[in-house]
Amino acid sequence: MPKIEKTDAEWRAQLDENEYRVTRQKGTERAFTGKYWDTHDDGTYRCICCGAPLFRSETKFDSGCGWPSFHTPNDEKLIDEHVDQSFGMIRTEVTCHDCGAHLGHVFDDGPAPTGLRYCINSASLKLEKDGK
């Protein structure tokens, strides 16, 4: 169970329409449209809903899929995994442990050292650049 619980009205007041659709309604942004899919700045990618430090820029890589991709979470305890059988597929959904926000999915076709590809919606993230 998420540590941070808010009403639907509170989430709607905090997030813009796209952030709400992605994080609270398990939406997906179109490939190559999110603000972080091609970002190369150093920093920490935080949950847009609660600020949890989910991924570091050092683990981000270009997977060619059009979404920010990471091979390792900042702390595995901050990411929860769930079986997702929507759209006739079986995938592994990843959510923020602290607030339950839908982040994206994890696949087993990533690079070393983990072989994993955390395919994350930009709308679920906020980049805190190093030194700021």
UniProtKB/Swiss-Prot annotation:
Active site: C119
Top-level taxon of the source organism: Bacteria
Signal peptide: none
Cofactor note: Binds 1 zinc ion per subunit. The zinc ion is important for the structural integrity of the protein.
Positions annotated to bind Zn(2+): C47, C50, C96, C99
GO molecular-function terms, A-Z: peptide-methionine (R)-S-oxide reductase activity; zinc ion binding
Required cofactor(s): Zn(2+)
NCBIfam families associated with the record: peptide-methionine (R)-S-oxide reductase MsrB
PANTHER family: METHIONINE SULFOXIDE REDUCTASE (PTHR10173), METHIONINE-R-SULFOXIDE REDUCTASE B1 (PTHR10173:SF52)
The protein's name in its UniProt record: Peptide methionine sulfoxide reductase MsrB
Organism: Dechloromonas aromatica (strain RCB)
Gene from which this protein is expressed: msrB
